[in-house]
Amino acid sequence: MKRVSLLLSILAGLAVAGVLASALGAAEPPAAIPDGVTIGGVPVGGLTPEAAVSAVQQGFETPLEIQLRSTRILVTPDILGATPVVDKAIERALIAEPNSVIPLGVSVVPGAPAAFIAKLAKRYDRPAVDAKLFLRQLRPWLSKERAGLKLDRRTAVHDVATAVATGVRTGITLTQTTMRPKVTRANFGPVIVIRRKSNKLFLYNGMHYRRLFLVATGQHQYPTPLGRFSIVVKWKNPWWYPPDSPWAAGQDPVPPGPGNPLGTRWMGLSSPGVGIHGTPSDGSIGYSVSHGCIRMHIPQAEWLFNHVEIGTTVFIVAS
C-alpha cells in the first residue's frame, strides 16, 4: 500500500513538472533575427519577425527621387507596380549568420514602370515648333522656331525599374533629347510677294529682301487672284494650251519656241490656270494686261525659275 502511494506521488509530481515546463515554454519570447543582419539594406538584427516585417516594409516604401532636368520628382514604389516579397526574406534572416546581407525580392507588375514613364513624357516632353510664315506690312515675317524635348523612354524605364527592384532610391537622372525644328528663320527658302496694283514682284529669302522685278498682271476682266499660293509645278520650254475661256476660243496649242506666250519658263501656282512665266511681249511688262497670269521678261523669268522651288510661297496682294 505504501508503494502504491509513493508511485502516485511521483506521477503527480511529474505531471506538475510537465505542466510547469509547458507553461514556461509557452511564455518564451519569439525568436529574434541574429545581430547585424540586413534585408534589402534595412537593419533587422535583434528584431522579432513582426518588427522586421514592419521595418523592411517601411524602408521599401521610401519614395524614389528622380531628377528630370531641373525638376525633382518623388514616386513611391506602389505607383511603379512594385511589391516587396518580405516573408521569404524574413525566413532566411531568422536562420542566417550574424551580419548577413539578405536580398529583398521585389515583384513588379509588367508594364507599370513604362506606364509611369509615359505619363512623365506626356507632361514634360514638348514637340519642336517650326518657324511659321506670315505676311506683315507686305513683307514676309517668320515666327521664331522652338526646339523640342523628348524623354529617352527606353533608358528611363530600365533605370526606374532597376532602381525600385534593387532598393536604390536616389541618384536616378532621366535625360531628354533636344529635338531640332526642321524649319527655322535661318534655313527658310524663297518667298515671293506680288503687288498687283503696282505690277511688282519681290523675291525674298525668308524675311530678307533679295530682288525686285517689274511684271504684268491681269486686266480688269481677268484679274490676277489675290491670296496666298504656292508654286506647284515648274516647266522648262512649256507648251501653251488655250484655256477654256472666251478670249482663247479658236486658238491652237503653241509648241516651245519663239512666239510661245509662256516664253521659256512656267511656274504654275496653286490657283488653277495661273502662273508666273516669261513673255515675248516685253512691252506689256509694268501693266495690267494679262489674262490673270504674272508675266516677266524672259531672261528674268529664267533667273527666277532657278531661284525658287516647288512649294515656294507666293503672296499676291492688291497694293
Predicted feature locations:
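Envelope-exposed proteins and targeting segments
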Residues: 33-40, 60-64, 71, 129, ...
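Sec-dependent signal peptide cleavage junction
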Residues: 22-30
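Short glycine/threonine-rich beta-strand-turn micro-motifs
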Residues: 30-192, 199
